[in-house]
């Protein structure tokens, strides 16, 4: 007889049904040795053997393969310490679940220890995260960056009745009750089936409106295009598309191969739970580790290992799937470009979290870094896709534009020309993929170095982490260039040429932000939620910097004006008429009015800035 480590199938045998209906299973599994009291909550981990089709047990059905538990008390990610509980592992005889078979050998089970999660503990790390969420002035919320819903319905911060009637798992797409953890997120059966059909090829949906339809429990069937977009936004992904996104089952089976008994049946071996296993990390569950490679800080990896990690973090290609009808119009062109940008932003957040060391930064720093460089990264990706296509911009495999095709959009031709020129320079340098991914990571980590000064010791420490990560990525780029076979002098020149192009990309990004803001102001195109928040974050940040610059300039002008006025009062008069004018009450009144007006302007700028 073989045992399975996954949830029991629907067509279970009577013996398996008896296992599920056996009374008092949990008291037998978890004895009093663990010190669990009545207020202890056992939270089923969403990452089990079948990650995309896991359904939490309902009623009396208990699947011993799905009772992997986790807790922030012992999570290395959250910084908690907990005494080892390996001594509490209780080897169980299979007779607890089903009677012994007369002919087959009975497998022995080794149940993983539960990790107690008490609601009464002071969870410092989570409280700090919530403080960031409440106090942050950023338009891009931390919940959007890391997928953590503020109302706790994602399962990371469950209510005390998580195992009973108070189950608070809701579908991340339509907010209906979730039937399980499917394709990387908690979702209902309807959205699970819809996403499954869509990734199998039935995804040529077109929104009849403006691609901003509301998707909820009552309106989820009204627009398939917006529903699919919402699925991607919340982090649903096809398991097995990329190697680093392979299922948890595949990773576990590589480490724990099944043992065959004498009858040829596979006996599932379930040992100690391993905290660093590769599993699909969606934006809805940011606090789980990414694996050994991404868990450690980037400076602990060799340059070759770091380059490989960044290469594997690259997101997949995105398709528009909604061909633009020719001739192009300003509205249709901008709608397609913003649609692609919004999809890329969703994947960009997942990509950033896979950069080694990025998730170890504070939430506010993660948000700020992405806010400062999102368009730079999008434009660098556009150049990389276009480097082998002279004279064309490859926004996606199904959206390739010539220079002249951008004439329908007002003000975009200058940006197109700059994009083509920078892409041509990358083509001349024969940019390699390893160099491209290193430059991309450098843009992310270097984006906020000069945007604000650290105010607190925590800010200084966090800034140090970012700089150390940036140094590691820089070393990785230098190592990549050293493998080209060039001389040391030529390697230095190539490094300088590549880094100098980053300033051109930043200039392009500023032009793009300005143009996108103009299109938004003219109501040419309606922006999607995430793209709109990113744009507003850039706009508000630019306004703050402009206000600070204006205030400094006004103060300087005031000081210079005061010095000039005092100097002019002390200079001897060359003419009698000038002397009379200088001592006249009317002239002194004019000077006083000028100083008063400048002081009033300074005060108004101070108020606006505050």
Swiss-Prot record:
Q: Which SMART domains match?
A: HOLI, ZnF_C4
Location of region: Disordered? 566-596
| Basic and acidic residues bias locations | 577-596
Q: Which Gene Ontology terms of cellular component type are present?
A: nucleus
| Tissue-by-tissue expression | Predominantly expressed in pituitary, telencephalon and hypothalamus as well as in the liver.
Q: Does the keyword Transcription apply?
A: yes
> GO MF terms on file?
hormone binding; nuclear estrogen receptor activity; sequence-specific DNA binding; steroid binding; zinc ion binding
Q: Which UniProt keywords apply?
A: DNA-binding, Lipid-binding, Metal-binding, Nucleus, Receptor, Steroid-binding, Transcription, Transcription regulation, Zinc, Zinc-finger
Q: Where is this region: Modulating?
A: 1-170
Under CDD domains, the record lists: NR_DBD_ER (cd07171), NR_LBD_ER (cd06949)
Q: What is this protein's name?
A: Estrogen receptor beta-2
Taxonomic lineage is:
Eukaryota, Metazoa, Chordata, Craniata, Vertebrata
């Amino acid at each position: 007889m073989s045992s399975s480590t996954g949830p029991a199938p629907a067509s279970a045998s009577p013996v398996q049904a008896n296992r599920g209906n056996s009374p008092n299973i949990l008291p037998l599994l978890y004895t009093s040795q663990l010190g669990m009291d009545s207020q202890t909550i056992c939270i089923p981990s969403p990452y089990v053997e079948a990650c995309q089709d896991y359904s939490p047990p309902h009623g009396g059905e208990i699947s011993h393969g799905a009772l992997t538990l986790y807790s922030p008390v012992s999570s290395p990610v959250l910084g908690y310490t907990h005494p080892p509980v390996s001594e509490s592992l209780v080897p169980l005889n299979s007779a607890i679940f089903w009677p012994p078979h007369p002919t087959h050998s009975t497998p022995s089970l080794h149940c993983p220890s539960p990790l107690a999660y008490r609601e009464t503990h002071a969870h410092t790390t989570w409280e700090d995260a919530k403080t960031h969420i409440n106090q942050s002035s950023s338009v891009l919320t931390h919940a959007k960056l890391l997928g953590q819903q503020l109302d706790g319905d994602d399962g990371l911060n469950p209510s005390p009745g998580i195992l009973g009637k108070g189950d608070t798992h809701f579908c991340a797409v339509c907010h209906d009750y979730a039937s399980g953890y499917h394709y990387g997120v908690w979702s209902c059966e309807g959205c699970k089936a819809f996403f499954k059909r869509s990734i199998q090829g039935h995804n040529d949906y077109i929104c009849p409106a403006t691609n901003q339809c509301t998707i909820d429990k009552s309106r989820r069937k009204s627009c398939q295009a917006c529903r699919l977009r919402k699925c991607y936004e919340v982090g649903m992904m096809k398991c097995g598309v990329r190697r680093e996104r392979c299922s948890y089952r595949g990773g576990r089976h590589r480490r724990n191969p099944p043992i065959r008994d004498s009858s040829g049946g596979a006996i599932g071996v379930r040992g100690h739970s391993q905290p660093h296993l590769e599993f699909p990390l969606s934006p809805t569950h940011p606090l789980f580790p990414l694996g050994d490679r991404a868990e450690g800080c980037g400076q602990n990896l060799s340059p070759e290992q770091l380059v490989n990690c960044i290469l594997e973090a690259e997101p997949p290609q995105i398709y528009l799937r909604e061909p633009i009808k020719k001739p192009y119009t300003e509205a249709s062109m901008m709608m397609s470009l913003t649609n692609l940008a919004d999809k890329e932003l969703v994947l960009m957040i997942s990509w950033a979290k896979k950069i080694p060391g990025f998730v170890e930064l504070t939430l506010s720093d993660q948000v700020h870094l992405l806010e400062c460089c999102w368009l730079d990264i999008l434009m660098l990706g556009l150049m990389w896709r276009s480097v082998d296509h002279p004279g064309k911009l490859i926004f996606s495999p199904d959206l390739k534009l010539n220079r002249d095709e951008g004439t329908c959009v007002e003000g975009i031709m200058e940006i197109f020309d700059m994009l083509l020129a920078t892409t041509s320079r990358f083509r001349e340098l024969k940019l390699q993929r390893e160099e491209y991914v290193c430059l991309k990571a450098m843009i992310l980590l270097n984006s906020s170095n000069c945007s604000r000064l650290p105010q607190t010791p925590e800010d200084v420490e966090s800034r140090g982490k970012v700089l150390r990560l940036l140094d590691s990525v820089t070393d990785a780029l230098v190592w990549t260039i050293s493998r080209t076979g060039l001389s040391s002098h030529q390697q230095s020149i190539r490094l300088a040429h590549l880094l100098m192009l980053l300033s051109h990309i930043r200039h392009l990004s500023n032009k793009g932000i300005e143009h996108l803001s103009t299109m938004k102001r003219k109501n040419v195109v309606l922006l999607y939620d995430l793209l709109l928040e990113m744009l507003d974050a850039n706009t508000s940040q630019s306004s703050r910097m402009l206000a600070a610059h204006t205030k400094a300039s006004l103060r300087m002008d005031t000081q210079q004006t005061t010095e000039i006025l005092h100097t002019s009062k002390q200079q001897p008069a060359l003419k009698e008429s000038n002397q009379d004018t200088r001592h006249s009450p009317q002239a002194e009144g004019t000077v006083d009015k000028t100083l008063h007006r400048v002081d009033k302007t300074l005060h108004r700028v101070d108020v606006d800035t505050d």
